[in-house]
């Protein structure tokens, strides 16, 4: 307290604690982690909560191929806060971490690791390299998660490569196939030419690309219904005008699609006629920079042109004019270039016209085949410019506009993808879509917009392409008849494959021939033959992770189905949330989760996406090294994670300051609890001063706020309530006011303050334990213990409101007292500015009061009132006087206190020297020293 040494310093009860002001978290946290591991914290916590209601937060498996980033840290810490809080709230909340271990990124890493040998290794050898890579990264990522303070069963995580997982996944596939939800067919799918595999919608990301949009004319070759003759239009000079942004698909053109409900016009340019939608004539002419043209005759219904024929722009074949409702007037010409092999709408409309072939002149690597004629061997992206140049030279191109548009990219390699019709395995969403809608309605979505988002995605999505033309994954468990090629999936084959995988893992698919796997007696339903081959595709990794509700929730004895919560980032609405929902509804008829909680992306301090190339990223390891994991955890709690969360070095620096204020509150209290034994030194409630009861009432309000925040997973609310309590209620008020009582007195008055502070810190520490898991344990270790307190704070019960609650009259009284104190502080500041006083203890305050204010202030003993104002003397005077204040009926005047300054407590008093042995002490301090 004193800056200058005094002979009485040793008689003061100055704060004394080994709890350090500087946190030193980067060094302390690893020691705590070691202690938690040696004492088996997680498993003992589960035993401690055995028999309590369960809360199951099911972990969405991160991909096991690299170090964690800030987004992963955000995700895992949110989960850990929930798990810790639920375990303190009266639940047994196990946490089984999972890892997604199959898929293309790992396969590509494995291939790159073998270099030139990749052409020589077998599929089985490649899979073994992949498994080794995935397993190594599981260990790396697990250590990184634990370093963040995440607790869970890391000794027994669930892995999608485990035999028992793969076996259960096969069974889910079989259940869906049995219900008719799995089929194989030719359809256009997202295809990555670089990865050489089909992709699901969840594996697509959109980026802005430059492209040439062109208007191309196709010459009419046949008019079987005499439409042109009817309107006096010469067929040999008539063209349909199409618009496309994918020039490379023109070799696959087999039809031009019109809308039968739209009107079309004949536009004469020179002596040639061009058919296009009436409403789009002007925009087409403007785009083609054609100013001299004439619309001939009246508009014609699009339906009249059906089944006309036209010549391909360069190949020796004819196409068909067909009708489709997907044709709009939003852009283009109203005549849609239709290549059934390269577009979903195109494919679907062509299915209505059996005479229209599906042509796919592009191979797995994105190269045009001989079906493209002279462009065979060209990569599709290069072919765009070559075909455009040739068609422009031939006069087929009427106009060209360079545009930027959003184009789909592979989220693995980030390169543009194409639509390509191939034989693939699909999950028929259309067959159970209504059931999915009903399941969505049973789920609690947080934020609530998640309900409509998921419903909209399910409504708009096509059938799910679940096959991939790769090696590292769970094989499609299908057999093919050698004689007729029909695929074969039965209950018996599914059981045989599942049993085999459970015993040997999915590598067995590559070890044995089909006849060694398929049960004896299986015959082809179509031709009766019994010789077989195996499917060579693997399942989409989203089918892997989408099966966790069966392979994990139903199989692990400590878990249950459905989960109470799935919690992931917003991108999982098209990923894990959705794949899990689809497989669960398809196999069980219900959602796999009762609630879904969603968080946003991590962005930089300016709100921009983090990229290594931009140099705006920040790594969890950097923050841990500089500040400790608790600061990352505080960042998570202080953020509104339902939207994008900003992260950066400045933000973490600011948070470290906020953390310091919370830590110093705890340190001050611990320092003043030196020598305090809660088993013997706690005073009864009626011995507490009013301000102590006010502090406990403020604590009760904190409990109410934080309980409410935790209940709805609003940790931002918890953080702000804790921060304001520590800074405003404690440091700026209660702890400041009680310093004289703590430092300068002994007996009941001091013990009353210590009693309140002890209860405050015990409660506060429990409240922050789910968030600041390391710091709260450090505080807990320094707190004096009572019987029944656990070694680890996470084993304690979360505080419940009511124990320290005060009635509204008491709260109103103290709100008024604090308002009076604020007015006194203003006057003291003015007196300090005028050099009347220095420190506030040099002041004597006169309060001029009306009757109501007088009665309020007079209800507090004058020495306690002086302590409340942190002055040496307070006098109450009925009537007007002093400076007017914001408190009605109150005037405030301040003067230098009379008497001398006590060497020990620094208060001014006229009792200085009243004890001859202590001539520099006030009577109060002299009696304390002599006691």
Mark where each language-model region is:
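Residues immediately within or flanking Cys/His clusters that coordinate Zn2+
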Residues: 189, 407, 478, 521, ...
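Residue patterns forming the tRNA-binding/recognition surfaces of aminoacyl-tRNA synthetases
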Residues: 2-25, 31, 35-39, 111-251, ...
